[in-house]
Amino acid sequence: MMKVLFIADPMASFKTYKDTTYAMMREMAKRGWRLFHTLSGELSVNGGLVTAQASAFEFLGAKNDDDHAWFKSADKVQTALEAFDAVIMRTDPPFDMQYLYATQLLTLAEQQGAKVFNSGQAMRDFNEKLAILNFSRFIAPTLVTTRSADVRTFLKEHGDIIIKPLDGMGGMGIFRLTEKDPNIGSILETLMQLDSRTIMAQRYIPEIVHGDKRILIIGGEVVPYALARIPQNGETRGNLAAGGRGVAQELGGRDREIAETLAPELKRRGILLAGLDVIGSNLTEVNVTSPTGFQEIMKQKGFDVAAMFADAVAAWSVR
């Protein structure tokens, strides 16, 4: 019987009707696996050993239920991470210093024999915005800088751009700028904090009106359906957290080419689960911290993404 520890946000905060971590847990519980939960802030090192204040939990019913308690937890027990068959890091960004420290502890735990997914090293190496620079043939014209003057030059060259912080999530802090925007100066000052914060700028991709696509890669294999996240009217962000609407669709063409090119490289780097974001024919992000979209694809297309993930965890935990 597998013992799996989830490092995740408080379980009482889960929106069970759409939460991907919840879907993972449900599938593993169906298989009879023993499940445990901890917070990233409950990791510690004692006597050189990486441990967590972990609590075993079980489901109280067979259905998603946001209105009532859906789980029952036992008391927390300080447990070495190496005692679990798999440790799954599912804490949401931002990737701040606390997140960085957690990944460093996870790397130490891996050296002690723990099986961590995604690995601490992979999460540090793959900034979700900067990672696309490793795959330049799939991306739109892109600038990374701390200098607002560089952004102004880039804007003049392309006329219509998107700027975003490197540590955001859910569409937070993303702005669209055109040359005629009267607020260019104030937006750059706010986002770049007077040239002290590194940001990414990209040429605006007009296909965003049809949605950006979340493509999932699990254990080096491509999920055959993408989740198109379509912006609300008047929005430039398709993120579900920003009010976008998720529509599952079959993967094909350029989207499949991008996914199948990245899949073996992500596997080589120890990334069990990744979510690629694609707008039009352009790769815009590689999400490795806490990719979502499982439940939307499962409900709309009947493809069991959670089962595919659990299969991969079982296989990778004995590698």
Curated annotation (Swiss-Prot):
Q: What is this protein called?
A: Glutathione synthetase
Keyword tags: ATP-binding, Glutathione biosynthesis, Ligase, Magnesium, Manganese, Metal-binding, Nucleotide-binding
Which cofactor is recorded for it? Mg(2+); Mn(2+)
The UniProt record lists the EC number as: 6.3.2.3
Signal is among the record's keywords: no
Report the superkingdom from the record: Bacteria
Residue positions annotated to bind Mg(2+) are E285, N287
Output the lineage of the source organism.
Answer: Bacteria, Pseudomonadati, Pseudomonadota, Betaproteobacteria, Neisseriales
What is the catalytic activity of this protein?
Answer: gamma-L-glutamyl-L-cysteine + glycine + ATP = glutathione + ADP + phosphate + H(+)
GO MF annotation list: ATP binding; glutathione synthase activity; metal ion binding
Instruction: Give the record's GO CC terms.
Output: cytoplasm
- Name all ATP-grasp domain ranges: 129-314
Family under the similarity heading: Belongs to the prokaryotic GSH synthase family.
Which InterPro entries does this UniProt record tie to the protein?
A: ATP-grasp (IPR011761), ATP_grasp_subdomain_1 (IPR013815), Glut_synth_pro (IPR006284), GSHS_ATP-bd (IPR004218), GSHS_N (IPR004215), PreATP-grasp_dom_sf (IPR016185)
**What PROSITE patterns is this protein classified in?**
ATP_GRASP
Q: In which pathway does it act?
A: Sulfur metabolism; glutathione biosynthesis; glutathione from L-cysteine and L-glutamate: step 2/2
Positions with a binding annotation for ATP: 155-211
- Cite the HAMAP family for this sequence: GSH_S (MF_00162)
Cite the Gene3D superfamilies for this sequence: 3.40.50.20, ATP-grasp fold, A domain, ATP-grasp fold, B domain
Q: How is the cofactor bound?
A: Binds 1 Mg(2+) or Mn(2+) ion per subunit.
SUPFAM superfamilies, sorted: Glutathione synthetase ATP-binding domain-like (SSF56059), PreATP-grasp domain (SSF52440)
Per UniProt, what is the name of the gene that codes for the protein in this document?
A: gshB
